[in-house]
Design a protein with these regions (language model features):
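Active-site anion-handling motifs in enzyme catalytic cores
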Residues: 1-372
């Protein structure tokens, strides 16, 4: 196919610690190039004015934190995906910038990741802009809810309205499908995160070596830890007879007294830490994804965030892969059960086929639209 496509999500090396949004964006670039030989425009959208941009750079890019070095390495990884897949990439901050990029576009795709979370509502993430003749679809967007929550009532009315312009909708969480069908009045499909759809050799080739002398447990908790976290990891340490714990958190304090806290690592180093860990302990969706891609033993420790409300991301991906027992807390931990990686791979392959069917059916909509 030679149709011209536009993909809108977030893919921002500035936010170097949000590894999931970077990896899903790189995966989407590869997927888009597989489905068209035409022009591909990838827009990384985040609404922020000049003052916020300047403040962000002043806060993050001083040499003393180590952030700058990781940022430069991560930006290099992103540029490699842009170059290898021949992508017209832009970071945009308002609708006026976006409209300039939609000329001769036949299909617009939004996704993946949590761009539809009600706390982040912005009509741009629903492709609620541009000419009505353009086909609009979502791929693996995450709105990890099963019901309307009190703090987001007003936002859901806006979401429902924005969904009306979508021609086809796919989301990442199966548990959210009935809810989004109610909001949109349309058929909704659940599909795999795009990181599962690309050749895993791509991820192996993106790994950056870190010199770590001893076996280690990798703890990645993006949104802070609770008081029971150290008890949970202590049990993991005893199970594996490992003392070396590497902790990476993006906000909040570490509850560990005898662990090495990592400040900033590049996206390639993040992949290395997952692949080579004896065990991964995480509350991150994409750390779970890459643990399964690399066949690294892992456990999920969910840390609720009251401000963001209900969040079904972890239980949904674990259920999809038959790994529900990996979601545990400090009072409930069975480390004796091994992961059946053959069963996991079979589940991934089944869902991968279903996901590609959705993508191919979406592409066929462009052909039908051109014939009219």
């Amino acid at each position: 196919m030679k149709s011209n496509l536009l993909c809108l999500s977030w893919l921002d090396a500035d936010n170097v610690m949000n590894y999931g949004q970077i990896l899903q964006g790189c995966a989407m670039m590869n997927i888009l190039r597989q489905i068209t030989q035409g022009k591909i425009v990838y827009l990384s959208y985040f609404s922020r004015g000049p003052k916020r941009i300047v403040k962000y750079y002043l806060d993050h890019y001083n040499l003393s934190t180590g952030h700058l070095f990781s940022y430069l390495k991560t930006r290099k990884t992103i540029k490699s995906f842009i170059r290898n897949n021949r992508i017209c990439f832009s970071q945009v901050h308002n609708e006026s910038q976006i409209n300039k990029k939609t000329k001769n576009i036949e299909l617009m795709i939004c996704g993946s990741d949590q761009i539809w979370h009600p706390q982040n509502y912005d009509k741009i993430y629903f492709l609620d802009f541009g000419d009505d003749s353009i086909i609009r679809t979502s791929y693996a967007v995450s709105l990890p809810k099963t019901q309307i929550e009190k703090q987001f009532i007003g936002v859901y009315h806006q979401i429902s309205y924005s969904l009306r312009r979508m021609n086809a909708i796919s989301v990442r969480e199966k548990g959210s499908v009935p809810f989004i069908e109610t909001l949109s009045g349309k058929k909704v499909y659940d599909v795999l995160d795009p990181t599962y759809l690309v050749d895993r050799e791509i991820w192996y080739n993106s790994i950056e070596y870190i010199k770590i002398l001893d076996d280690y447990i990798f703890v990645y908790i993006p949104n802070g830890m609770d008081n029971k976290m150290s008890e949970f990891v202590d049990k993991i340490k005893k199970r594996y007879c490992i003392l070396n714990v590497l902790v990476l958190i993006t906000r909040g304090d570490s509850c560990f007294l005898d662990a090495t806290r990592l400040k900033y690592v590049s996206v390639g180093q993040f992949l290395y830490l997952i692949k080579n860990a004896r065990c991964v302990v995480t509350s991150s969706f994409h750390a779970v994804v890459f643990s399964t891609i690399f066949h690294s033993d892992f456990f999920c420790y969910d840390v609720p965030n009251p401000n963001r409300g209900e969040d079904i991301r972890l239980i949904d991906i674990l259920s999809k892969l038959g790994l529900q027992e990996r979601l545990v807390n400090s009072d409930m931990l069975d480390t004796s059960k091994r992961i059946d990686w053959i069963a996991v791979e079979n589940a991934i392959e089944k869902n991968r086929c279903y996901s590609w069917n959705f993508i191919n059916n979406t592409i066929s909509m462009v052909g039908k639209n051109n014939d009219q």
